[in-house]
Amino acid sequence: MLNKNKRWYLIALYDIYQGLLTTKQCEYFNLHYFKDLSFSEIAELKEVSKSAISDCLNKVCDQLLKYEQALLIYEKNKKRNDLYTLINDSELVKKLKDI
């Protein structure tokens, strides 16, 4: 079982990198992380083994972490958002976010 922070981190990475995953990987990720289905429930629904679901989702998580390690899109967005909080001018913050 993932802790809550890691779960949200993986969901954030998925939002960024889902276009790099296969249709099946996206489907399993959505069922588990967004629909909150267990591996057993997904396996029954998709008529595959529980271990196939587990293997696929472990691979997806590894890929998402690998993509972030290489591209750092999440990390850069987080740093950028942290800097926005230091700016007192809300008009300027809005303009910067629109870029």
Swiss-Prot record:
InterPro entries given in the database record: RNA_pol_sigma_r3/r4-like, UPF0122, WH-like_DNA-bd_sf
UniProt family annotation: Belongs to the UPF0122 family.
Functional description taken from the UniProt entry: Might take part in the signal recognition particle (SRP) pathway. This is inferred from the conservation of its genetic proximity to ftsY/ffh. May be a regulatory protein.
Protein name: UPF0122 protein UUR10_0158
